A protein has these predicted regions:
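Short, amphipathic alpha-helical interaction segments positioned at domain boundaries
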Residues: 63-99
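Leucine-rich, hydrophobic repeat-scaffold detector
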Residues: 82, 102, 106-109, 123-242
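Short, contiguous acidic/charged loop-to-helix segments that flank catalytic cores in large enzymes
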Residues: 2-5, 35, 74-75, 87-92, ...
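Non-catalytic, well-ordered alpha-helical scaffold segments
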Residues: 8-12, 41, 45, 63, ...
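P-loop NTPase catalytic cores that bind/hydrolyze ATP
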Residues: 11-20, 26, 116-137
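C-terminal boundary/linker of central alpha/beta nucleotide-binding cores
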Residues: 2-71, 98, 102
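Inter-repeat boundary and helix-capping residues of tandem alpha-helical solenoids
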Residues: 3, 90-97, 114-115, 122, ...
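Short, well-ordered loop/turn and helix-capping segments at boundaries between secondary-structure elements
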Residues: 19, 66, 71-75, 131-135, ...
């Protein structure tokens, strides 16, 4: 296949499929690789049963394909995991994840385009930075307003917390402090309903992490309540809950 379609092209496609969290849509493969649909159709046909469609995404049919891709393009040692891999292999794996994270970021949260949905951005970008061990970039991603909203809508509080716990294992950081800094940076209009909704979601998440007694958590919980009263009056759901 490399001889027919180019070793560089095949390496790029197989490496990005290896790095993806749970496969890629064909539109994402085309966007990432820059291939034209007809070019990709020939390559896809040549790859045959090594790839399968899983809920609209292409994934490797068997683990042996993941191993083969790792061995050929990332100096792998004939195993799936990172344990026992050489420093060269680990670096190449991190590079593959980092490159995919950057691609998703370049298309994420842009109105009027459909290559990367908010749901896919929330699924892939934090995961890719974590796998790349780019801790500062992961932290920056998690404290972006649109990413926070997307994760809480399309993923879960548990998943968001898991990223922060991984961060705390590797760098000096604090969830509440980082979101307090981010909140100030966002410069939101506190009278808008969307601001109140976000404040409540963030307060709920911080409470979920065990920080319900912290000053910033209380502050945004109070803001959410005041915003709800301002927008809806005393009979709103948040008001009654509080």
């Amino acid at each position: 296949i490399e001889g027919d379609y180019g070793a560089k092209t095949l390496k790029e496609i197989m490496s990005v499929l290896w790095a993806a969290r749970a496969g890629l849509r064909e539109e994402e493969i085309l966007g990432y690789s820059g291939l034209k649909p007809m070019q990709w159709a020939y390559i896809r046909n040549a790859l045959g049963p090594t790839l399968i469609d899983a809920s609209g995404r292409l994934i490797f049919a068997h683990d042996y394909m993941r191993i083969a891709v790792s061995d050929r393009y990332m100096a792998g040692n004939n195993t799936i995991g990172n344990e026992g891999q050489s420093q060269e292999a680990l670096k190449l794996r991190c590079n593959a994840h980092s490159k995919l994270a950057k691609w998703f970021e370049s298309y994420a949260f842009k109105d009027g385009q459909s290559i990367v949905s908010d749901e896919r951005a929330a699924e892939e970008i934090p995961y890719q930075w974590q796998q790349a061990k780019e801790w500062k970039k992961l932290q920056t991603t998690l404290t972006k307003q649109k990413m926070l909203i997307a994760i809480l809508k399309h993923r879960s509080e548990q998943e968001l917390l898991s990223y922060w716990l991984k961060l705390e294992e590797n760098i000096k950081t604090d969830i509440e402090t980082q979101y307090e800094k981010a909140w100030k940076k966002w410069k939101l209009d506190q009278t808008e309903e969307a601001t109140g909704d976000l404040a409540q979601k963030l307060a709920d998440f911080l409470s979920f992490t065990g920080r319900w007694h912290q000053a910033f958590t209380k502050k945004i919980a109070d803001l959410a309540l005041e915003n709800s009263i301002h927008v809806h009056g005393n009979k709103s759901e948040i008001t009654n809950r509080s």
